[in-house]
């Protein structure tokens, strides 16, 4: 399968501070990669590298031709005094045709919001509008920076359901950044745990194995949410230095 984007041993420094060290990953059509990590781990920098906004100091980046990327930012800052409907907000995107706006909103089950004020939207509604905006250029790769931030668990289930539907319909790759270190989208193909370098990687454990979780959030939640169990051979001290766990050596 041809990669959309691949990073090989990428490192990024800002001044004397090493933010990313020897990071490798591969984004493929129809596959979901979820990136986890604590605050300050370099997740946002890695996203900017994938988007082509940051040039690494070391390593190799390969992109598939004129790659179309749809991006959903972590936060949206709007002037609350500026009257702005969803329709007008989406038309601010360069190259957008007005006849494409309603179909994009309907695709994310948000057609009814077309004339709603942006400032009045809930967290989940805002994420759907931003996702519709990302779909306007028919992306081959969706980059979602903490798409479930500020959304409750039921909203997360609905968003994950929608993301899974879109990746199947579009056969697009998905890079998803998560602020939750353990609860991830169950249908993620690969999870990477980042703390300036790749600490560990693997697949999520589907929560359908946990009856207590099913009783709390229902079978639909169990289908869309998964637990990722970390398997680090080290920890990081307060200065960010690697401290190997007992029984492991640096080799």
From Swiss-Prot:
<dbReference type="Pfam" id="PF00005">
    <property type="entry name" value="ABC_tran"/>
</dbReference>
<keyword id="KW-0997">Cell inner membrane</keyword>
<dbReference type="GO" id="GO:0016887">
    <property type="term" value="F:ATP hydrolysis activity"/>
</dbReference>
<keyword id="KW-0864">Zinc transport</keyword>
<dbReference type="InterPro" id="IPR003593">
    <property type="entry name" value="AAA+_ATPase"/>
</dbReference>
<dbReference type="InterPro" id="IPR003439">
    <property type="entry name" value="ABC_transporter-like_ATP-bd"/>
</dbReference>
<keyword id="KW-1278">Translocase</keyword>
<keyword id="KW-0813">Transport</keyword>
<comment type="function">
    <text>Part of the ABC transporter complex ZnuABC involved in zinc import. Responsible for energy coupling to the transport system.</text>
</comment>
<feature type="binding site">
    <location>
        <begin position="37"/>
        <end position="44"/>
    </location>
    <ligand>
        <name>ATP</name>
    </ligand>
</feature>
<dbReference type="GO" id="GO:0005524">
    <property type="term" value="F:ATP binding"/>
</dbReference>
<keyword id="KW-0547">Nucleotide-binding</keyword>
<keyword id="KW-1003">Cell membrane</keyword>
<dbReference type="GO" id="GO:0005886">
    <property type="term" value="C:plasma membrane"/>
</dbReference>
<keyword id="KW-0406">Ion transport</keyword>
<keyword id="KW-0472">Membrane</keyword>
<keyword id="KW-0067">ATP-binding</keyword>
<comment type="similarity">
    <text>Belongs to the ABC transporter superfamily. Zinc importer (TC 3.A.1.15.5) family.</text>
</comment>
<dbReference type="GO" id="GO:0015633">
    <property type="term" value="F:ABC-type zinc transporter activity"/>
</dbReference>
<dbReference type="GO" id="GO:0010043">
    <property type="term" value="P:response to zinc ion"/>
</dbReference>
<protein>
    <recommendedName>
        <fullName>Zinc import ATP-binding protein ZnuC</fullName>
        <ecNumber>7.2.2.20</ecNumber>
    </recommendedName>
</protein>
<keyword id="KW-0862">Zinc</keyword>
<feature type="domain" description="ABC transporter">
    <location>
        <begin position="5"/>
        <end position="220"/>
    </location>
</feature>
<dbReference type="InterPro" id="IPR027417">
    <property type="entry name" value="P-loop_NTPase"/>
</dbReference>
<comment type="subunit">
    <text>The complex is composed of two ATP-binding proteins (ZnuC), two transmembrane proteins (ZnuB) and a solute-binding protein (ZnuA).</text>
</comment>
<dbReference type="InterPro" id="IPR050153">
    <property type="entry name" value="Metal_Ion_Import_ABC"/>
</dbReference>
